[in-house]
Design a protein with these regions (language model features):
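Conserved catalytic alpha/beta core of Sir2/sirtuin-type deacylases, generalized to analogous enzyme cores
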Residues: 1-52, 57-207
Length: 207
């Protein structure tokens, strides 16, 4: 494995030959291995009241961290009330193809599957188990954004919060920092006057 046989480019827009099904680690001999998460990470998760899955590449940033031993068990702990996915504003090669891009539900399913693999389980995860890993989903809505089926997610116990973003020169939507912070505050239980003010500004945030 000292010679690189795989060429990878995130800038390449061509569809992958097939959808990514699974991510795993290998040792120098090409054998699959299961790595333990950093103890400091597990300690932080044990004390956390909220987890935020931030914007980024699903299979080259998020999933490799979730499949580490101990992470899935820590995230699935019911004492963590808020497990918030900030959904990407666009799909990329990892979540294609262009003809059938990932929906929000498929992002959630991939996260749940990674969490289950961290715990030693293989195969797909039952849909009713998704909320053990994701309880809330913040998203944009517009051309090019992943499809969000609010009713379907709500039936699984996952709350959705729509945020209005900014149209960039390249044509894609980006999260507005103020609106995103506002959505996180509302999601994590900031009620009263702040919530009323947030929900009344329909040009910024819609639940």
């Amino acid at each position: 494995l000292r010679k690189q046989y795989i060429t990878f480019s995130k800038a390449d827009d061509d569809d992958l030959p097939a959808r990514i099904e699974r991510i795993w680690y290998i040792n120098p001999f090409g054998q699959e291995i299961r790595l333990q998460a950093n103890p400091r990470v597990l300690s932080a998760l044990a004390e956390a009241q909220a987890i935020i899955y931030s914007i980024g590449s699903l299979y080259t940033s998020l999933v490799p961290s979730l499949i580490l031993k101990g992470v899935g068990e820590a995230i699935a702990n019911p004492s963590i009330r808020y497990k918030i996915l900030i959904l990407n504003s666009t799909n990329d090669r990892e979540t294609g193809p262009l003809s059938a891009p990932f929906s929000a539900l498929e992002f959630v399913a991939a996260i749940a599957k990674a969490g289950a693999e961290s715990r030693g389980f293989s195969g797909d995860v039952e849909r009713q188990e998704y909320k053990a890993y994701v309880t809330h989903l913040i998203h944009l809505q517009g051309p090019g954004t992943p499809r969000v089926d609010k009713e379907e997610l709500n039936e699984l116990g996952i709350e959705t919060i729509r945020v209005y973003g900014r149209r960039m020169e390249e044509g894609w939507l980006a999260y507005d920092e103020k609106a995103l912070i506002q959505a996180l505050e509302v999601t994590m239980g900031k009620r009263g006057a702040d919530m009323v003010a947030a929900m009344s500004r329909r040009n910024t945030l819609e639940g």
